[in-house]
Every structure is written in structure tokens, then in C-alpha cells.
Amino acid sequence: ATIPRHWQSFSFSPRSDGIAFLSLGIEEDARWLAVASPDGSGSRAIEPLGNNASKVQVAWSPNDQVIAFSRTGQPQGLNEQEVLLIGKNGENFRSLIVNGLGFQSRWSPDGERIIYSVSSGSSDWRPQLWIAGGKPDTAGEGKRSIGLNTWADKCSFGSATTLYCAVPKTLEAGAGLYPAAVGNTPDNLYRVDLTTGAAQLIAIPAEEHTVSQIIVSDDERFLYFTDRISGQ
């Protein structure tokens, strides 16, 4: 089957029997958050996007309840943002109030929690990593800062309680608002125990690498990463 070109930002269901995506038609009333079978059949519109497509992160939760985060909640002031959790049947679950702007997130493997990065005045608008409850009935509970200045998409879970992150060696003030302008800043690698919140430096690469993606082996003995500079 051929997937329409205006379908973008795909996320697979936990059993890989469905996809969530943004259907971005030319007209605002033809833009939707939607689901379908992996071959594109049986598509179903979930929520209208209008001109808010850039505020929606498609991310199907491991517990099969949430398919996207939407930064379209009620205004909360300069240093806070309300993020909505959207269900696969259009449910608007309990929202998440985050301490900053530029929300990026990742689910824990069991879907119980999310890690996310935001930037605020308290961090000089550098990205800061947080963890919070992620289930529809616990969204935002136990929210706490992990204490690392990096983005959620530079992290990967080793288990439900272990996180590995690439952390830029240096970040200018304001970097969280303009991540594309950071360039090829080299990273160090950290391991985070999510039970205690302790972050440990585990590697300073011999050569300077800018990590774009981390892959953790099943036994957590090895980390593999894609280097943004070389593409390898």
C-alpha cells in the first residue's frame, strides 16, 4: 500500500498494528491527528489540527492509551505551559503542566512515566530535563528535575528506571528556544537512575561527537549512537 504524502510524523502502536500520524492537508480544515492500519487502510480522524500542527507531538504510549501530546492548553504564564494528552479515541485526559517552553518528550518503556525537556528563565532558557507521571490518571504527578541540560530526543531508556542521555558540553543561554542554532556542540554521556534521580557521567568520548540518537543494548552493556556531524 502507498501512504499519502501529506501523512507525516508517524508513531506505531505498542503491538505495531496501528499508526498515529498528522494528516496535513492544504486547507486548515483538512488537517487532522489521525490513526490507521500500518498499510494506510482504515484511517480515522481523531482531533482537528487547524493551524496547530507544529504544537502536536505524535507519540503512541506503550500502554496503548495516549497517541499524542499537544501544546495547546490554557495559557499558564511565561514560565509554564499546559500540555494535553490525547487518547486514541479522542479522549482529553488529565493535562500536564510543565515548567517551561519547547516541550519534547519520551515515554518510559512501561508507559508509567515520561521524561521531557523544557526551557525557562530559571535555566537561562537552556533545555532542562524533567520526569513526571505519564499515565492518564497520574499525568504530572511526582514531577521533578533530573538536573541535566539537554533535550529529551537526545535520551533513550535502558529500562523503566534507567535513562541514558547525551548532554552538550556547553550551551549558550537561550539555546533551548533555538535548538537548531546550537550546531555541532560535542556531547558527554550520562546514565540516570530514575528511582533516585541521580545522574552519573559515564563517558567522555575520545573524539568529539554530537549525538543525534542513542540506542541501548538489551543488557545495557553497550550504547550505540548516531553522530550528527558524520551521520554515522
Residue ranges and their predicted role:
Residues 1, 72, 81-89, 126-128, ...:
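Short, intrinsically disordered, charge-balanced linker/junction segments flanking boundaries
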Residues 34-39, 82-89, 128-135, 183-196:
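Beta-propeller blade signature
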Residues 39-44, 89-94, 136-142, 196-200:
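Beta-strand initiation motifs
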Residues 170, 175-231:
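C-terminal closing repeat unit and adjoining cap/tail of repeat-based domains
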